[in-house]
Amino acid sequence: MADMKSIQADARERMGKAIEALESNLSVLRTGRANPGILKKVIVDYYGSTMPIDQVASITTPDARTLVITPWDRGALGPIEKAIRDSDLGLNPNNKGDTIFISLPMLTEERRKDLVKNAKNYAEDARIAVRNIRKHALDEVKKVEGVGDDEIKRGEAEVQKITDEFIARVDSTFHKKEQEILG
């Protein structure tokens, strides 16, 4: 049987992973500035195998609205361009022979609202994950043997305190991204 400290440490670690997943999901959402992270989920079909774009090319941002993709092998230019076009990012790659340029258009108000809505959904998914972890931890606390009711109540209160801390981090992460999107 686990003790209170290990239950709390496990809950904290798992809630931390929920925050990492949220940050990863939010990094893909486009803001008004060029960010190589928006291409993170673009998968390139290259010589019969699929791999993330950052494994076949370097991605740089020379200015606030341009991404430059330089493949390590010129043979990857076509597949990279196709993968970007086929993604649901709404980007238009421009092949210059040895590099691909992507000029990011200004976000329309409607697109910004859609992005905020997506960010809100990711944040809600993270909140649900944190609450599920809390429920699991509280169940584990109640199963601990050889401790009194007071100790169980303290353990439950500590799990709730950890949960509140991580929910606040979810909210903070969401609001930061919302401000980025709305500019």
Curated annotation (Swiss-Prot):
Keywords: Cytoplasm, Protein biosynthesis. It is found in: Cytoplasm. GO terms for biological process: translational termination. One of its GO terms (cellular component) is cytoplasm. Pfam families: RRF. Gene3D superfamilies: 3.30.1360.40, Ribosome-recycling factor. GO terms for molecular function: ribosomal large subunit binding. Belongs to the RRF family. Responsible for the release of ribosomes from messenger RNA at the termination of protein biosynthesis. May increase the efficiency of translation by recycling ribosomes from one round of translation to another. This is Ribosome-recycling factor. It comes from Deinococcus deserti (strain DSM 17065 / CIP 109153 / LMG 22923 / VCD115). The gene is frr.
